[in-house]
């Protein structure tokens, strides 16, 4: 896992350069958003169970066919696996949010996901929708708590959504 600071420093170290205005600006941006990142991570941590329940409820309300015979969440085992995956997306997105880098999402979530989902015949559309729902629910909570930095929350979730949408699962 690599955070935003390490990524910037590594990039400059590899080219043997001192930090220029661009690098300093990136570091300033990361540090200025630090308290908001921590507050958002705390909200996610404190409300993870409710966020997950709400996302699952909305997903299955929108797509009830997933719970019917033949659906990808039909049977207790498949339903539990779906909820577990949604929890993984939330947890790893919170790590990416705090680190200011989507690197962990690539390493721990996205790499190998295509093969896994293909082997299990898991459709990508409900997965993408569940990630969108997680983002929307968190953004609503941030609005209630007067935290305006939605760009911070959008970055990891949009990275997951874009990467999954690009894959031919």
Curated annotation (Swiss-Prot):
GO terms for cellular component: chloroplast thylakoid membrane; phycobilisome. Signal peptide: none annotated. Coiled coil: none annotated. It holds the Pfam family Phycobilisome. InterPro entries: Allophycocyanin_b, Globin-like_sf, Phycobilisome_asu/bsu, Phycobilisome_asu/bsu_sf. (2R,3E)-phycocyanobilin binds at residue 82. It is a peripheral membrane protein. Its main location: plastid. CDD domains: APC_beta. SUPFAM superfamilies: Globin-like. Belongs to the phycobiliprotein family. Heterodimer of an alpha and a beta chain. Light-harvesting photosynthetic bile pigment-protein from the phycobiliprotein complex. Allophycocyanin has a maximum absorption at approximately 650 nanometers. This is Allophycocyanin subunit beta-18. The gene is apcF.
């Amino acid at each position: 896992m690599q955070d935003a600071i390490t990524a910037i420093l590594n990039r400059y170290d590899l080219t043997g350069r001192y930090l220029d205005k661009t690098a300093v600006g990136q570091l300033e941006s990361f540090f200025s958003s630090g308290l908001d990142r921590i507050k958002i991570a705390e909200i996610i941590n404190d409300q993870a169970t409710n966020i997950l329940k709400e996302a699952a409820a909305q997903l299955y309300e929108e797509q009830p066919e997933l719970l019917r015979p033949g659906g990808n969440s039909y049977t207790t085992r498949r339903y539990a696996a779906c909820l577990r995956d949604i929890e993984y997306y939330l947890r790893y997105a919170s790590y990416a949010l705090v680190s200011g880098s989507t690197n962990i999402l690539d390493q721990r979530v996205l790499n190998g996901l295509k093969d896994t989902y293909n082997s299990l015949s898991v459709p990508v559309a409900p997965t993408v929708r569940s990630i969108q729902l997680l983002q929307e629910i968190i953004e609503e909570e941030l609005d209630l708590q007067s935290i305006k930095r939605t760009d911070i929350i959008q970055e990891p979730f949009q990275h997951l959504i874009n990467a999954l949408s690009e894959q031919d699962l």
